Amino acid sequence: ITAMAEPMVSHDCVAFYLLSQEVSKSVTVVQSGQGADEVFAGYSWYPPLAKVPREQGPAEYAKVFTDRPHAELARILEPDWLLDDDPSRAFIRDHFATPGAETTLDAALRLDSTIMLVDDPVKRVDNMTMAWGLEARVPFLDHELVELAAACPPELKLAHGGKGVLKEVARGNVPDGVIDRPKGYFPVPAIRHLEGAFLDRVRDAVTDPVAKARGLVRNDWLEAMLADPNTARTNLGSNALWQVALLEMWLQERGI
């Protein structure tokens, strides 16, 4: 949490932090594969978006990428902290309205590669690696490569289960077993299922007098979460209590 420039609730922060700690013992610079999925359409949710009419794009994109609907935030936040409008939906709608992306998939890839990617996963990995003096470079985000990929027809990127054109270029240069293996993630079970000492730390943070004085979260919601910390999940499958706890821990760490 100390290494985070801003609150980062993704489970993989812990994994990247520990991995960077180990890798930094022998090297100072690593190459990261970040950006390949966003630039070359590697994620599983891109093929369904390719079938969505352009005018329906913002609503369908929001279903995939909006972790907490505005209505749910109204059940979590105290009224003084809740905005009347839905800034997430407005942001997506405005971006999709920008000219230059002919299809829903093109608009989604543009948003992901120019905004979501650099403001979330790239920033996460940069924070976790630099905490150990490790520099992570991102060759898939070379601007000329990104521009070339943006001009590539969507069907070529979606081929072969995603990142099709990239896989074809790599074939013969990279072992097939690497190219065709199932996609891997960095799961952190302790953050998905809160119990024991870790749950105690979460409870201490959200019930701290500083948190109560802040008055960010509704007491009824918080009490329900602490009574049953592992049932409630966000749209994207994260532990709902952990996200609130991480925010509170980060604020307390910064003396805010």
What are these regions (language model features)?
Residues 27-43:
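Short acidic/histidine-rich active-site segments
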Residues 39-65:
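A mobile, often basic/glycine-rich helix-loop segment
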Residues 25, 29, 58-256:
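Adenosyl-5′-phosphate
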Residues 17, 21, 168:
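Active-site phosphate/pyrophosphate- and oxyanion-stabilizing loops and adjacent acidic/basic residues
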Residues 1-18, 45-55, 151-156:
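ATP-dependent adenylate-handling ligase core
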Residues 1, 43-44, 190-193:
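Short secondary-structure transition/capping segments
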